[in-house]
Amino acid sequence: TVFQEFFKKAKKLNTDIIYVGGDIVHSKTQGISPELIDRLSWWFTKMAEICPVHVILGNHDGLILNKDRQDAISPIISALDNPNIFLYKDSGVYSTGFDGVNWCVFSCFDEVGWKDVRPVAGDINIALFHGAVWGSKTDVDWEIEGDVTVDLFENFEFAMLGDIHRRQFLNEKKT
């Protein structure tokens, strides 16, 4: 399968970190089947056997408009209780496990916490975000009028953006 090929390649490359940028499932909280739980448990466990796995949630992983409901991913990761899997459900600044390198999470389930996400001076700060960014393009070249602009990420050395589904640069410098 594609996943087995990915696992082989990640092992061969001696991958240090796997980052999953959300939209792991499409069903939000509806239609969660035993097969889905089984496949996700297998997928997360196999990745965690290779290296630490860092995960943020996407809009399809839970109900953005009803944040009191549990998302589809948290209970699976919690039940796995694997010390090599890290889920960042709340906005904040977290260690990547490498000295001087931080995840700066802007969670789509915790927009209130965005104001507290600030880069750490002297460190490498990687913004993680799952959502529509103004000016990004879909895989059919449709330009998105997003919820945020790239200015949200201007103080960070890097930004890894989920939800866009297409590799692209969103600034003139192509950084």
Protein language model regions, located:
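Core catalytic region of metal-dependent phosphoesterases/phosphodiesterases
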Residues: 1-94
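A structural signal for the main folded, soluble domain(s) of proteins
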Residues: 4-12, 111-113, 166-174
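Generic signature of intrinsically disordered, low-complexity segments enriched in small/polar residues
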Residues: 6-9, 22, 97, 112, ...
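Active-site neighborhood of phospho(di)ester-bond hydrolases with catalytic His/Asp-centered motifs
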Residues: 17-23, 52-59, 86-91, 106, ...
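Short, conserved loop/helix-junction motifs that constitute active-site signature segments
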Residues: 45-49, 118-121, 150-155, 172
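Conserved catalytic scaffold of divalent metal-dependent phosphoesterases
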Residues: 61-151
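Conserved beta-sheet core of the metallophosphoesterase superfamily
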Residues: 134, 139-175
